[in-house]
Swiss-Prot record:
GO terms for molecular function: rRNA binding; structural constituent of ribosome. It comes from Trichodesmium erythraeum (strain IMS101). SMART domains: KOW (SM00739). This is Large ribosomal subunit protein uL24. Keywords: Ribonucleoprotein, Ribosomal protein, RNA-binding, rRNA-binding. It comes from the Bacteria.
């Protein structure tokens, strides 16, 4: 039986939320693991465990038992979470992965920028 791992708790009893450098909808490249080199879109960010779910990356197969009498079992494929340190933001224009930095625009907004290309993300 597999059990879900409980997130770390702070001194006040609240779960710790890690700062994750990617957001939902970002295009990322996998830099470590079995799917190294693949590029995909972030579907979900899990800040309590510092993981992200990327489209068509880290695919697992689950064998599901039949729920009702006449129903047959199924094999379901789904994306599993991958640690946020194993992904890097990807520029679709220049086809290169890069770290990010935070800069301010002329009107004073704080935005994320790719270090290699200088491309502003949001």
């Amino acid at each position: 039986m597999s059990r879900k791992k409980k997130p770390l708790m702070s001194a006040r009893g609240k779960p710790i939320r890690y700062k994750v450098h990617v957001k939902k909808g970002d295009t990322v490249q996998i830099i470590a693991g079995k799917d190294k080199g693949k590029v995909g879109e972030v579907l979900k960010v899990l800040p309590k465990v510092s993981k992200v779910i990327v489209k068509d990356v880290n695919i697992i197969t689950k064998h599901v038992k039949p729920q009702q009498e006449g129903e047959s079992g199924k094999i379901v494929t789904t994306e599993a979470p991958i640690h946020s340190s194993n992904v890097m933001l990807y520029s679709t224009k220049q086809k290169v992965a890069s770290r990010i930095c935070y800069t301010f625009t002329d009107d004073g907004r704080k935005v994320r920028m790719l270090k290699k290309t200088g491309e502003v993300i949001d």
